[in-house]
Structures are given as C-alpha cells and as structure tokens.
C-alpha cells in the first residue's frame, strides 16, 4: 500500500481532475504551482482556488462536530470522498478536504 500523498501529489491529481496542467517550482520548504495560463494556483493555501475547484467538481462541504471537529467533502450524490479533522484551523481543513476530494476524483481520470 502506498503511503500518504504529498501536497504536490494532491495538487497534481486535483489539477488532473479539472483537466489543468500545472508546473511546480520551489524547494523542500515550500513550492508554488503555475497553470498553463501562467497563473499561480494552490487550492491548499488559496480560498478562491479551493472554492473554484469545489464548484468545478461539484464537491459539497460539510462541517461536523461529532467526536471532534471535522470537515467532509462529498461527491455528487452525497458520498464522502475526503475528510479532514481540525482543531481551530477550519479554513485550512476545508481547503485540504476539497483538495483531497479532488485528488480522489483525479485518480479516476485517464
């Protein structure tokens, strides 16, 4: 079984899910990605990029507080395809859940 995906892996698959090519640059401490239209894109850190990604892929977001706070990302039809627990970083958790869900969708893209 494969280990945890890196942020770069998640972003590559999320971009694939929406048919976008991205290039990465930076170092081990951080990186940026640029779309084929030369625009910065990182839905893990940018609320607008994350919202556009969820809209394009019809991902619904639920905030739950059962046994701890968590964010769930749902595919069309209501199936949970990603969830991310958080303490007090709801924005980060929401963006991460969206990107994880998009990455799951991207895995199915040929």
What are these regions (language model features)?
Residues 1-110:
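Glycine-rich anion-binding surface patch
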């Amino acid at each position: 079984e494969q280990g945890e995906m890196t942020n770069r892996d998640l972003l590559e698959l999320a971009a694939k899910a929406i048919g976008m090519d991205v290039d990465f640059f930076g170092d081990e401490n951080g990186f940026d990605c640029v779309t084929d239209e030369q625009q910065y894109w990182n839905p893990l850190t940018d609320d607008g990029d994350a919202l556009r990604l969820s809209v394009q892929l019809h991902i619904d977001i639920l905030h739950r507080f059962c046994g701890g706070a968590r964010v769930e990302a749902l595919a069309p039809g209501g199936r949970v395809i990603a969830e991310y627990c958080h303490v007090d970083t709801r924005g980060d958790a929401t963006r991460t859940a969206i990107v994880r869900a998009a990455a799951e969708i991207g895995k199915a893209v040929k």
